[in-house]
From Swiss-Prot:
Protein's name in the database: Protein ADP-ribosyltransferase PARP3
A GO MF label: NAD+-protein-glutamate ADP-ribosyltransferase activity
E.C. number: 2.4.2.-
Source species, domain of life: Eukaryota
UniProt catalytic activity: L-aspartyl-[protein] + NAD(+) = 4-O-(ADP-D-ribosyl)-L-aspartyl-[protein] + nicotinamide; L-glutamyl-[protein] + NAD(+) = 5-O-(ADP-D-ribosyl)-L-glutamyl-[protein] + nicotinamide
Keywords in alphabetical order: ADP-ribosylation, Glycosyltransferase, Metal-binding, NAD, Nucleotidyltransferase, Nucleus, Transferase, Zinc, Zinc-finger
Positions of the PARP catalytic domain: 594-827
Domain PADR1 zinc-binding: start-end pairs: 49-199
Pfam families, alphabetized: BRCT, PADR1_N, PARP, PARP_reg, Zn_ribbon_PADR1
Zinc ribbon: region residues: 124-168
Domain WGR: 338-439
Purpose: Involved in the base excision repair (BER) pathway, by catalyzing the poly(ADP-ribosyl)ation of a limited number of acceptor proteins involved in chromatin architecture and in DNA metabolism. This modification follows DNA damages and appears as an obligatory step in a detection/signaling pathway leading to the reparation of DNA strand breaks.
Family per similarity comment: Belongs to the ARTD/PARP family.
Amino acid sequence: MVHETRSRTLAASQEEGKAAPKKQKTESKEQEGGQQAPSKNKKTADNEEHDGEQEPSKNKKLKAEESDLNGKATAVKEFSEFCKAIREHLTIEDMRKILQGNEQDASGSEDAVVPRCEDVMFYGPLDKCPVCGGQLECKGLKYNCTGTHSEWACCSFSTNNPSRRGGPIKVPDDVKNDFVRKWLKQQEGNKYPKRNLDDEGIFSGMMIALSGRMSRSHGYFKEQIMKHGGKVNNSVIGVTCVVASPAERHQGGSGGFAEALERGTPVVSENWIIDSVQKKEKQPLAAYDIASDVVPEGRGLPLGNLDPTEEAIETLAAELKLAGKRAVHKDSKLEKDGGHIYEKDGIIYNCAFSVCDLGGDINQLCIMQLIMVPENHLHLYYKKGPIGHDQMAEERVEDFGSRFNDAIKEFVRLFEEVTGNEFEPWEREKKFKKKCMKMYPLDMDDGVDVRHGGVALRQLGAAAAHCKLDPSVTFIMKQLCSQEIYRYALTEMGHDVPDLPIGMLTDLHLKRGEETLLEWKQDVESAPESGPAADAFWMEISNKWFTLFPTTRPYTMKGYEQIADNVASGLETVRDINVASRLIGDVFGSTLDDPLSQCYKKLGCSINRVVEDSEDYKMILKYLEKTYEPVKVGDVVYSATVERIYAVESSALPSYDEIKKLPNKVLLWCGTRSSNLLRHLRDGFVPAVCHIPVPGYMFGKAIVCSDAAAEAALYGFTAVDRPEGYLVLAVASLGKEIQEITGTPGSEDVKRMEEKKMGVKGVGRKTTDPSEHFTWRDGVTVPCGKLVPSTNKDGPLEYNEYAVYDPKQVSIAFLVGVKYEEQNMEVVPDE
């Protein structure tokens, strides 16, 4: 809806801005026909004499505008006639030779070569791309670079006024054509005309039909189509596409809409016209398709084109199709026949790949498997296509029978075709080099993604009924072992592709993601701030990340905040979900009678319910109430109430007995997603992956906590439809030396703090009232106090944050289960 509203607003402003030129064109046509346009204000002889000085200047201006319009029309007409002549007199082979002779791209099909040659011969040879040195090519109303910025990215440079070389066109001697020689002779000494793409049509060669009630009149859209080179037809027969309002599909559709569905004619939103005109380039019809999912056999809408809420519903409910390295893909239909992944000489023949190139509008995946079914029948399963759009994918199952060697050869051939790399060096040694426009392997591990192996919603009751743990512990284990929290986490980050096991990747793949992040961190500091080079830099970063960790909605990230929110935070969450997958395993695929108890044992962690009348419970409740501020989502404000509290003692963490011997101990809040909790309980808190100069990562490789429950709630808040989450209370020793920071520390400062492993306090704009702080037990300070303004009014942090660089100085003490509730909610009594 936001997209639609913006487009309409822009279209309205364009329509108003075009009013004057439309009038001038009418006047020009009347004058061309020999008729003088009638004046609205007829002048007397006296008036004419009085205005005698002004009239010539007005006439001169009108004539200049008329001449300019006629000149543009003449240039377009001359080019059109030249194109017809070129196609008549030159062969495709001649055109290729002329392009090569002028250092232009001569590759591609006839449809690519012909317009390229016409442009070069009439307007002059194009200079190379100023960003990457590639070849420019006219596409729509812009010249786009066809080169590559790196192996990860196509060049994104585009312009409507490209630089061209001077001098005559070079025609190779073996092009024997009198027409070309004669035409070149005529052009000697003349300058090349300048190509004005705005005068040419976006919709050139297209016949378009309009259907049903639209947001604007049919007359408006008809004018836009015809003004940009297209034609409008009243019938659906023979048209390129039918344009309709998105509301048509919900209202049953008009006659034209229904007829288009029957004929298989594309039906697109009116925004296709608006956006094509706005962007000065014909947009792909598939991206504006509003009818495919109406037809039962239709292609369906890509997940990336759905409303984000609809996409979330689709992916949350979707069955995970590929759960790990040994899992048979669901779409092959061979699992039900007893199929399993073929393995020979230590190689498991199951590969997944992806590639994202935003400049080339590419976001694809590929799956290849050799599947053995009973009676030694070997099948090759192959799937390749756009991520989130199964109906557009190329997909096949090929039965090789007992021809095992042939199946392996075909698998290896496809691997090399898809990636440009050899198969065995990758599988045996993980040697791989990304090739331009080729896919990159998603290194799956031998296990089961928690979205498949975890407890499904309908299985929760049975799992809890068989659990021998204390009911209060069963409750939390049921939450942490369910599929739901991990599905939601991946959905919120956009990494919920059903075809790919993002929750079962190798440590090597995750390490590559971390190394990539660290490289970017260094490169960003010296990256250009604006211009084509900056665009290319950020596009390459985005392409690389969304190739390593695929999504249905890739976009170009820019700035430290987006790297922190999407890359750093995303990597940490995917890493922790992978740990959960290994801990939980395949709950109901195993023979375990009590999977929840088994997972609890693997944690190596003691979890016990804190009773409500205990001193610890009362202390924590007071600490939360004092340091919490409501979370605001849109216009709704949410408060947090304590549901239950658990005391935690983990064998992986420093014990409380060890921590209590350390200096400057503080009980602090830590916010985390529920999907990250199993990792924290098993391994303790892990320092942030790197230093990024934004809150959350500004202290570098540190464990960051706060004295404000409000700060932790910002990380722990889930969603309005999932109001339950967990906050963590940990005892942290800040060491003997504590440094206070009021601003954003620089790279050198962070490096020094990491090396010294000192305790750091980042002073927020709000702080807890020191007069209310108290000591808990064994000298542990509880900074519990009302949130008040601090003296650091211009600091980057809203609340105080504490950074600890040594994981041995932090121990999780409590898990606080909270429920977020809407404040000031009006309750309507039953009548």
